[in-house]
Amino acid sequence: MLIFKLKRMAELLYNEWDLGKRLSGAKGKTCAYIYLFEILSETEKLVLKKENNKIVGFAGYSKWNSKKRIISKRFYGLMAKILINSPLVKNKQAIYDYNNEYDNIPSDLNNYFDGELSILIVDKNYRGKGYGKALLNKIFSLAKIDNMKNLQILTDESCNFKFYDAMGCKKIREVSV
């Protein structure tokens, strides 16, 4: 992926979510890059939404046990680990704790899902224009082509649940962490 795309994607993440920055004491956009690299290390397909040649949103999905893109997935995973263990992050354990909070799937659902919506983000200045809907529809189409039937969506209380309801998603479980 081109560096300018990575930079814009990290900028979107940084502007929208904390991603463990406050607790980890990480400098600048370090947590945004860590999160982006972790997303890319598991993502099967990634879709970008642009307006006037500027990335205004992106979405991706992961597929459990996929053997595709192994080299690039490992590269991005390594980049995330390097950043976590760098001097840019004061409290490394805080990053690991933050990540573990969102990787919680109940054991009775382990075999229900084929994969996960790894990311869906739209710049707050471009919301309400149908970009989120277009991105999610594209991800659903690509996942279907990839023979997937059930994608899990893990999110937090900042999520717009009405959006997912309108898209036909079904809430299976709600947990507070």
PLM ranges: what are they?
Residues 114-115, 143-156:
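Conserved GNAT acetyl-CoA-binding A-motif
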Residues 65-114, 177:
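Conserved acyl-donor/pantetheine-binding loop and adjacent beta-alpha core of acyl/acetyltransferases
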Residues 122, 128-141, 166:
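Conserved acetyl-CoA-binding loop-helix of GNAT-fold acetyltransferases
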Residues 54-63, 103, 116-121:
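Conserved beta-strand in the GNAT
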Residues 3, 10-27, 63-66:
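Helix-loop element at the rim of GNAT/NAT acetyltransferase active sites that forms part
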Residues 118-127, 152-162, 177:
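Conserved beta-strand-loop-alpha-helix junction that forms the acyl-donor binding cleft
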Residues 133, 145, 157-174:
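Conserved active-site alpha-helix within GNAT-family acetyltransferase domains
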Residues 23-46, 51, 60, 82:
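Active-site rim helix/loop that mediates acceptor-substrate recognition in acyltransferases
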